[in-house]
Amino acid sequence: MGRRPARCYRYCKNKPYIKSRYCRGVPDAKIRIFDLGRKKASTDEFPLCVHLISLEKEQLSSEAIEAGRISCNKYISKTGGKDSFHMRVRVHPWHVLRINKMLSCAGADRLQTGMRGAFGKPMGTVARVNIGQIIFSIRTRDNMLANVVEALRRSSYKFPGRQKIVVSKKWGFTAYNREAYQKLKADGRLMNDGANVKVITNHGTLAQYAKDIAAAN
């Protein structure tokens, strides 16, 4: 029996049903990589941030998310190089889909029970997304804007419903606007923290404050 089309599971109809000790035998999600590209790049290297945002409340299958990730990664790697960006998948397929299998061969009516005991068996996983929720985020250099927008446009064809591409006003994956980030950087109050930054505040001991300022500069 083939895989049931994802259009059968597009809408969020019931409560979330996740893997647990009561829900066993769930097949692994097709997507295994949620962070790709140059993950260790500092915040100063990739100031531009672009998001792919959902415009509908729906369910995205793990197969669709993986297809979108591959499509996006392939285009940017080909046009700008595999070290020219850092991409994050911002949704996770936690919700478990069920299927009540029916036999369709000759003599099946003597073997199956119809809708008696119709609670199905796990068949796959999906991510439940809301209106305005971010699906993919990419940080990169300013001159890569056109390439990133095109990559996200191509990946959006892998998903049902409508999506929009938004160029963020924030600096990379940080929580600060460009002006605020550059001001904090000029004041020497930012410490690198992976793909993000930590702001040195006027709290704590003087010794710790001096240590943080020295590390930032």
From Swiss-Prot:
A single cellular component GO annotation: lipid droplet
Pfam families assigned: Ribosomal_L16
SUPFAM superfamilies on file: Ribosomal protein L16p/L10e
Keywords of this entry: Ribonucleoprotein, Ribosomal protein
A GO MF label: structural constituent of ribosome
GO biological process, one term: translation
Subunit-level organization: Component of the small ribosomal subunit. Mature ribosomes consist of a small (40S) and a large (60S) subunit. The 40S subunit contains about 33 different proteins and 1 molecule of RNA (18S). The 60S subunit contains about 49 different proteins and 3 molecules of RNA (25S, 5.8S and 5S).
Family: Belongs to the universal ribosomal protein uL16 family.
Name of the protein this chain belongs to: Large ribosomal subunit protein uL16
Species, as recorded: Dictyostelium discoideum (Social amoeba)
